[in-house]
Amino acid sequence: MSDNYSLIIKNGSCYIDGKFQNVDLALSRNKIKKIGKIELNSNKVFDATGKTILPGVIDTQVHFREPGANNAENLESGSRAAVAGGVTSVFEMPNTNPPTSTFEEFNKKLEAAQNRMFCNYAFYFGATPNNMKELAAVDTLKAVSYTHLTLPTKA
C-alpha cells in the first residue's frame, strides 16, 4: 500500500550530497516526506522539469516600517510579499518610528506581529548610545540579535 501525499513535485533539480540531482519530492501537511523516485499518488502533481527546487529563503534584513510608516508597508503586507517571493523567514530591522530600541517598543512589535505574519519571523533590537542597560539584558527578549541604529533616536 502506498502513501497518499498532498503534493508531489516531479523531476525537480535539487542540490543533494554536493551535486544537483533530478528527484521527486512528496509532501504531506507542508512537510517533505520523501525524496527520490515517487509513484504518483496525489491529487496535486507539479512538474518541475527544468526547474531548481530550493528550500525556503531566509531574509535577514527586512524593513516592514511598522510602526511609523504603515502606509508604505507593514508586518502583514511585508510578510505576504516575502512568502510570494519564496521567503519563509524574515528578520525585521529596528529602524522604525519609534525605533525598536526599548523593551516596551520591542514587546509592542511582538504583540503587533501575532496572527498577522505569514512567515517565520524574528526582530532585531536596536542598539543606541542611550540604551546600554537594555542591551545588557537583550538576551532575555525574543530578539534574534541587536544591531546599531544610525539614525537620530531618543532611546
Task: Report residues per predicted region.
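Short acidic/polar active-site loop segments enriched in Thr and Asp
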Residues: T88-S89, V144-Y146
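Metal-associated gating/positioning segment near the N- to mid-region
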Residues: K51-R116
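Short, acidic/polar
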Residues: A72-S79, N131-T140
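Active-site metal-binding motif and surrounding structural segment of the metallo-beta-lactamase
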Residues: E39-I53
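Conserved small/polar residues in nucleotide/adenosyl-binding loops
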Residues: T147-P152
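Generic structural signal for hydrophobic
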Residues: A82, K109, V138-V144
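N-terminal metal-binding scaffold of metallo-dependent hydrolase/deaminase domains
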Residues: M1-N41
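Hydrophobic faces of well-ordered beta-strands that scaffold small-molecule active sites
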Residues: I58-T60, Y121-F125
